[in-house]
């Protein structure tokens, strides 16, 4: 991308990943507009005093407001959705309108406004269940839930509008983990770490399911790379982005090891196993993004657990079981999904 093109609209920029990414974009000289409904923390976790940051509180389904937000932007980074199956299933009509029906109008608005690049955060969960040893981007999509299905359905809705003046790129991130200012504690690594630190035990649901993982800082680094990469390297491309394909039980063992090292005064952390109806299991291959863009993760699941331990130690995550803001489904219930 032209080095002079440094204006980006981050839709969903107030969320878990956006809260870490946005300050870094500002530090790197971007003019950033965050468009977000801001029902979790408001804008308190964003650097509101930075003159290069503009925050628009809005609904992604509001086509007119989205169109105005796109004016003057060089790039759009679309991170917004009702995230995870439990939140989605609270109100399928609402979730369908947000996660699927609003998507193409946003793409059309961006193109009409003269945006040059559109980056969409899909999900590696579009693969559902696969016994393939390496799931590449060409693997058939076999989503198990509507949340995952709609992520996959949005991808061609972007691709059909791209051309030489409107570059589209899609990435399929793995389950994200680690500390960010707008913290989530309803994701696998983060859940297990919270329980290990604060309940001094780990409960594993199932255990054999394979899951790829992605540190939230690597997620942010990937977004920055996709914003800066030359058009010819990313145009109409889909990239897996998930590393450390671990079973849920192996994740639990990593969490146990790290938490016992970080909090030796708490003694041994037991692992308890219970049944699960979450059948998602897949081992993704992310070599394409390494070949095309040289992207490799710099952070591990162990790093994510250590970062969370430090956040707990510093009191950055108070009331980690009772504060609804850490849990998407509970926040949606609290504000009244409609």
Feature annotation, model-predicted:
Residues 2-75:
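N-terminal Rossmann/SDR dinucleotide-binding element
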Residues 60-98:
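NAD(P)H-binding glycine-rich loop region in Rossmannoid oxidoreductase-like domains
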Residues 104-146:
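Conserved Rossmann-fold NAD(P)-dependent oxidoreductase catalytic core, especially the SDR/UDP-sugar
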Residues 150:
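Active-site helix of classical SDR
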Residues 156-211, 216-227, 254-258:
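NAD(P)-dependent short-chain dehydrogenase/reductase
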Residues 200, 205-338:
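C-terminal substrate-binding subdomain of Rossmann-fold SDR/epimerase-dehydratase oxidoreductases
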């Amino acid at each position: 991308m032209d080095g002079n093109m440094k204006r980006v609209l981050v839709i969903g920029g107030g969320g878990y990943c956006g809260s870490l990414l946005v300050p870094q974009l500002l530090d790197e000289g971007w003019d950033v507009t965050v468009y977000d409904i801001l029902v979790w923390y408001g804008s308190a976790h964003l650097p509101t005093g930075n003159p290069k940051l503009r925050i628009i509180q809005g609904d992604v389904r509001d086509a007119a407001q989205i169109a105005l937000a796109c004016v003057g932007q060089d790039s759009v980074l679309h991170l917004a959705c009702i995230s995870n199956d439990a939140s989605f299933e609270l109100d399928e009509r609402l979730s369908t309108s947000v996660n699927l029906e609003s998507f193409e109008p946003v793409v059309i608005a961006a193109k009409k406004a003269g945006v040059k690049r559109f980056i969409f955060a899909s999900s590696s969960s579009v693969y559902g269940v696969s016994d393939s040893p390496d799931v590449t981007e060409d693997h058939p999509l076999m989503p198990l839930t509507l949340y995952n299905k709609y992520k996959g359905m949005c991808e061609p809705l972007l691709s059909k509008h791209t051309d030489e003046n409107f570059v589209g790129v899609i990435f399929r991130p793995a389950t994200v983990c680690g500390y960010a200012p707008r913290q989530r504690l309803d994701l696998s690594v983060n859940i297990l770490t919270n329980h290990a630190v604060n309940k001094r035990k780990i409960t594993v649901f199932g255990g054999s399911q394979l899951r790829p993982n992605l540190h939230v800082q690597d997620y942010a680094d990937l977004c920055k790379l996709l914003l800066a990469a030359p058009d010819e390297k990313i145009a109409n491309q889909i990239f897996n982005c998930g590393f450390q394909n671990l079973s849920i039980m192996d994740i639990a063992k990593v969490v146990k090891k790290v938490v016992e090292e970080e909090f030796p005064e708490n003694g041994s952390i037991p692992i308890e196993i219970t049944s699960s109806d979450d059948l998602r299991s897949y081992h993704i291959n992310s070599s394409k993004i390494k070949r095309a863009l040289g992207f490799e993760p710099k952070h591990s699941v162990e790093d994510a657990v250590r970062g969370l331990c430090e956040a707990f130690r510093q009191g950055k995550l108070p009331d980690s079981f009772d504060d609804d803001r850490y849990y998407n489904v509970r926040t949606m219930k609290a504000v009244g999904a409609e």
